[in-house]
Amino acid sequence: MARLKEFYKKDVVTMMMKRFNYSSVMEVPRILKITLNMGVGEAVGDKKVMNHAIEDMTLISGQKPVVTKARKSIAGFKIREGWPIGCKVTLRRERMYEFLDRLISITLPRVRDFRGLNPKSFDGTGNYSMGIHEQIVFPEIDYDKTDGIRGLDICITTSAKTNEEAKALLEAFNLPLKDKDRK
């Protein structure tokens, strides 16, 4: 079993039940899924870029991504409906906890000038979104073999009803959120 999953079952559930006065263990919020999304606008001009993005995403997540296609044609961006413009991966269960563990303990400390994640990135219903500007901060990506620097979006979906519950859950997992007084 993943280290963070054991930690959640043993420590986080009891801490959250005390803090929010839940009557049942099933009321305690949990992380449902983590979605990684990489928009690859350069793939319009060069098809190899998409293949490199798929390789990077596979290395980062541990599973093959789904290629996202343009929903409609936009002349200003020079894209047509159905053209590949990105890729995404949805992580659940064991892989999700393993990815979160790597993200918190290895990847985020490697980000240049990192001072914590923005605590205002909650969406109001208990989900947290963040962006990574360079995919090379992940230890799985070899800097010498990469063709370019691309960013990706990470969305952590929880079963929490409010932002306060979701923030408490993610802080229990040691996700480094900034303090409100410190900017």
Swiss-Prot record:
The keyword tRNA-binding applies. One of its GO terms (molecular function) is tRNA binding. Keywords: Ribonucleoprotein, Ribosomal protein, RNA-binding, rRNA-binding, tRNA-binding. The keyword tRNA-binding applies. Transmembrane segments: none annotated. Pfam families: Ribosomal_L5 (PF00281), Ribosomal_L5_C (PF00673). Disulfide bonds: none annotated. Gene3D superfamilies: 3.30.1440.10. One of its GO terms (biological process) is translation. InterPro entries: Ribosomal_uL5, Ribosomal_uL5_bac-type, Ribosomal_uL5_C, Ribosomal_uL5_CS, Ribosomal_uL5_dom_sf, Ribosomal_uL5_N. One of its GO terms (cellular component) is ribosome. Belongs to the universal ribosomal protein uL5 family. Part of the 50S ribosomal subunit; part of the 5S rRNA/L5/L18/L25 subcomplex. Contacts the 5S rRNA and the P site tRNA. Forms a bridge to the 30S subunit in the 70S ribosome. This is one of the proteins that bind and probably mediate the attachment of the 5S RNA into the large ribosomal subunit, where it forms part of the central protuberance. In the 70S ribosome it contacts protein S13 of the 30S subunit (bridge B1b), connecting the 2 subunits; this bridge is implicated in subunit movement. Contacts the P site tRNA; the 5S rRNA and some of its associated proteins might help stabilize positioning of ribosome-bound tRNAs. This is Large ribosomal subunit protein uL5. It comes from Legionella pneumophila (strain Corby). The lineage of its organism: Bacteria, Pseudomonadati, Pseudomonadota, Gammaproteobacteria, Legionellales. The gene is rplE.
